[in-house]
Amino acid sequence: MKVSVVITLAVLGIMFVWASAAELEERGSDQRDSPAWLKSMERIFQSEERECTKFLGGCSEDSECCPHLGCKDVLYYCAWDGTFGK
């Protein structure tokens, strides 16, 4: 009995992973990680109040990003640096 339950759960898990992979392939998972996607997200977080680069905005060094953001050196965008406060 226990073996059949374990086998059933394993088969369901494999089917879930397979279905998820097929769905991601249909949608084009590379579109989520592309720099074009980051640039489109930049428009959402734009603010006219500050002269610094906002969250997910393009950068080349940490000083270009707003407070509490740091420039990521893989795709060169501003992301949270893990600090809190004002």
From Swiss-Prot:
> Where found in the cell?
Secreted
Q: Where is the signal peptide?
A: 1-21
Q: Which Pfam families match?
A: Toxin_12 (PF07740)
Identify residues that carry Phenylalanine amide.
Answer: 84
Q: Which domain of life is it from?
A: Eukaryota
Q: Any coiled-coil ranges, and where?
A: none
The organs and tissues expressing this protein are described as:
Expressed by the venom gland.
Q: List the disulfide bonds.
A: 52-66, 59-71, 65-78
Q: Recorded GO terms, molecular function?
A: ion channel inhibitor activity; sodium channel regulator activity; toxin activity
Q: Indicate the principal place this protein occupies in or around the cell.
A: secreted
Domain remarks in the Swiss-Prot or TrEMBL record: The presence of a 'disulfide through disulfide knot' structurally defines this protein as a knottin.
Role of this protein: Inhibits both peak current and fast inactivation of voltage-gated sodium channels (Nav) channels. Inhibits the inactivation of Nav on DRG neurons (EC(50)=1.77 uM) and peak current of cardiac myocytes (IC(50)=0.90 uM).
- The protein's name is Mu-theraphotoxin-Cg2a 1
